[in-house]
């Protein structure tokens, strides 16, 4: 499949191995994993970072196999998940950083094009999240509200 904003083809990637039970070398129990996730969420980490830390430092290949729930659902149950989805939040952060760059460098036309592409992707995601009722129907993206949300 092709890339979204370029004429290039996508690169192939590896797939996760099909596994239905917890590997025997995983030493932590489901309760310990949930407690560790809540502890890392209190420190302000996002779910993707928490998953990477659990994989690299604690040897947990798949949180859903161990606990029966995903990292984001554990964070929602504990009350640490934000009302704006993470991917949308990260794109808004990226757009704000690019706007700050363009204030200092107004003639950087390549960054203007990049900002346009990022904001198009934000609008597509907002449309999707409104359709799936993750965001309210009255929610709108604007650079000013995004700046307030991120900071």
Swiss-Prot record:
SUPFAM superfamilies: S15/NS1 RNA-binding domain (SSF47060). One of its GO terms (cellular component) is cytosolic small ribosomal subunit. One of its GO terms (molecular function) is small ribosomal subunit rRNA binding. Residues 1-20 are annotated as: Disordered. InterPro entries: Ribosomal_uS15, Ribosomal_uS15_arc_euk, Ribosomal_uS15_N, uS15_NS1_RNA-bd_sf. It comes from the Archaea. Keywords: Ribonucleoprotein, Ribosomal protein. One of its GO terms (biological process) is translation. Transmembrane segments: none annotated. Pfam families: Ribosomal_S13_N (PF08069), Ribosomal_S15 (PF00312). Belongs to the universal ribosomal protein uS15 family. Part of the 30S ribosomal subunit. PANTHER family: RIBOSOMAL PROTEIN S15P/S13E, SMALL RIBOSOMAL SUBUNIT PROTEIN US15. This is Small ribosomal subunit protein uS15. It comes from Methanococcus vannielii (strain ATCC 35089 / DSM 1224 / JCM 13029 / OCM 148 / SB). The lineage of its organism: Archaea, Methanobacteriati, Methanobacteriota, Methanomada group, Methanococci.
């Amino acid at each position: 499949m092709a890339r979204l904003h370029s004429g290039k083809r996508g690169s192939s990637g590896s797939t996760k191995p099909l596994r239905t039970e917890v590997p025997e070398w995983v030493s932590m129990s489901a309760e310990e994993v949930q407690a560790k996730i809540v502890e890392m969420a209190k420190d302000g980490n996002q779910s993707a970072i928490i998953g990477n830390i659990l994989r690299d430092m604690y040897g947990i290949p798949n949180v859903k196999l161990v606990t029966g729930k995903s990292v984001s659902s554990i964070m929602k149950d504990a009350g640490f998940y934000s009302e704006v989805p993470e991917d949308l939040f990260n794109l808004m952060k990226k757009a704000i950083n690019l706007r700050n760059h363009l204030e200092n460098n107004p003639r950087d036309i390549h960054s203007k094009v990049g900002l346009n592409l990022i904001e198009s992707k934000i609008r597509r995601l907002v449309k999707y999240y409104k359709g799936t009722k993750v965001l309210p129907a009255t929610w709108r993206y604007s650079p000013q509200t995004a700046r307030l949300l991120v900071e």
